[in-house]
Design a protein with these regions (language model features):
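N-terminal Rossmann-like NAD(P) cofactor-binding subdomain of oxidoreductases
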Residues: 1-83, 87-89
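Solvent-exposed, flexible loop/coil residues
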Residues: 44-52, 203-207, 211-213
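Internal hydrophobic alpha-helix adjacent to the cofactor/substrate pocket in enzyme cavities
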Residues: 211-227
Length: 228
């Protein structure tokens, strides 16, 4: 009813709804941080392309699994130019998957794979999401696999370690639990995200990381406004 009440909107509905809302927000001149896998706006992973994204009025935060795994895949791609295939497998607690996530599983896979292609340059990719009903609830974690011939593992390890430090700047619970290893012709690594436990359960790190990514982008928008 009052579009002047804000300058920026966080949309955490569903992919199909955001496709409708995006046109309305654009007409109203409002920036949108899209937390659904709609593939409408520019894809953003703050540790990779934050500065590039603030020039766009509609920015997509990909998915929780994308925010977790793509930084590691990107770091590997920065150290290795001959990656043939990348696969990411994300596992989250069933209790942390709300109706929006469950309604958008196909969109989740498609958007995560699109983000993976865009950020790494590797066109042959696959994303898998597992909802684990175990009790007690598991922490959010992602495994990253990259098919590479004769990699420079020292360079890969250094690149990934640097990325983990960048991630911790805005996601304190981000942790490398299996550092990059090379076996059977592929690089494998695993990370997990433990939430802060302030508003959401600690096991819901998948929700914390996409929230933290969105807040980081919003803060960058605000800095840009203040500087100009």
């Amino acid at each position: 009813d009052n579009p002047t009440c804000c300058e920026l909107v966080f949309d955490a509905t569903t992919a199909s709804y955001h496709k409708k809302f995006a046109a309305v927000l654009k007409k109203l001149g409002l920036k949108a941080i899209d937390m659904t896998p709609s593939q409408v706006g520019e894809m953003c992973v703050p540790s990779i392309n934050l500065k590039d994204c603030i020039s766009y009025p509609n920015v997509n935060m990909i998915t929780c699994g994308g925010q977790t795994a793509i930084p590691v895949a990107f770091a590997i791609s920065q150290a290795q130019s001959n990656i043939e295939y990348i696969e990411i497998v994300s596992s989250i607690s069933s209790r942390s998957a709300g109706p929006g996530t469950r309604a958008n599983i196909d969109e989740y896979v498609e958007n995560t794979e699109s983000g993976l292609r865009q950020m790494t340059g590797c066109q042959n990719v696959k994303a898998i999401l597992n909802l684990n009903p175990a009790t007690p609830c598991i922490d959010s974690q992602s495994s990253i696999f990259a098919l590479v011939d004769s990699p420079d593992m020292d360079a890969v390890s250094e690149s990934v370690a640097g990325m983990v430090l960048k991630m911790k700047e805005y996601v304190p619970g981000y942790e490398m639990i299996v550092p990059p290893q090379y076996e059977n012709g592929r690089i494998a690594a695993m990370v997990k995200v433990r939430g802060l436990g302030d508003f959401l359960p600690q096991y819901a790190g998948n929700l914390d990381i996409i929230n933290c990514a969105a807040i980081t982008l919003a803060e960058e928008y605000a800095k840009e406004e203040l500087e100009h």
